[in-house]
């Protein structure tokens, strides 16, 4: 883990939290973030966002890009999903929704992750895209499709069956796992959309 301090008593990249904390403690207006890679930390210090650059490169290669996330609330007995789509021209499309299907509710937030991917791929096909790159933070989504993981639960079985019969022949989908809660702006946006749908019962498609 790397801690990048942009404004503080000392600036730069620190390899542990105590050192980073000493650099910002008591400093008014301190700016800092935590990253999984040194490359991301270095980019932050010079105001670069590697994920924005990565998405731009994907778009240039002709991919529709989608970041998906899911959420779940046990007390509400409800799951939700959020999708942040970036089109090749740089415009964005936001999708979110919720559900409480009793067949899938025992999968917690994983069913939300599943419906996020389903909605992203469905949107791509409906709008004439042939390639989509899906960034997600639950590795089962891709491993169920490749057979690396067995789809044992009803939710995962539904996902594999639907994908194979409805989507696979119509769009080329590439799955990329990203670390959850790691300052990836589009992933954080998908997370916010999912939480908004969960708490406010929003089910919308919004072009941004």
Locations of regions flagged by a protein language model:
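A short beta-strand micro-motif
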Residues: 1-9
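Catalytic phosphate/metal-binding cores of nucleic-acid and nucleotide-processing enzymes, i.e., regions
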Residues: 109-110, 114, 197
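Charged phosphate-binding loop/patch that engages nucleotide di/tri-phosphates or the phosphate backbone
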Residues: 195-208
């Amino acid at each position: 883990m790397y801690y990048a301090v942009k404004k503080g008593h000392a600036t730069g990249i620190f390899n542990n939290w105590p050192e980073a904390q000493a650099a910002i403690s008591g400093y008014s207006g301190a700016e800092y973030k935590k990253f999984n890679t040194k490359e991301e930390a270095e980019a932050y210090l010079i105001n670069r966002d590697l994920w924005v650059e990565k998405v731009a490169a994907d778009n240039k290669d002709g991919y529709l890009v989608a970041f998906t996330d899911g959420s779940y609330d046990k007390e509400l007995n409800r799951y939700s999903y959020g999708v942040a789509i970036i089109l090749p021209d740089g415009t964005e499309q936001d999708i979110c929704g919720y559900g409480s299907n009793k067949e899938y509710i025992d999968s917690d937030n994983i069913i939300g992750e599943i419906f996020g991917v389903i909605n992203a791929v469905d949107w791509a096909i409906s709008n004439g895209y042939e390639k989509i790159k899906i960034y997600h933070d639950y590795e089962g989504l891709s491993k169920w499709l490749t057979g690396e993981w067995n789809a044992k639960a009803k939710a995962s079985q539904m996902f594999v069956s639907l994908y194979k019969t409805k989507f696979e022949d119509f769009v080329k989908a590439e799955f990329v796992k990203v670390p959850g809660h790691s300052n990836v702006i589009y992933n954080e946006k998908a997370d916010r959309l999912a939480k908004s749908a969960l708490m406010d019962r929003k089910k919308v498609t919004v072009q941004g």
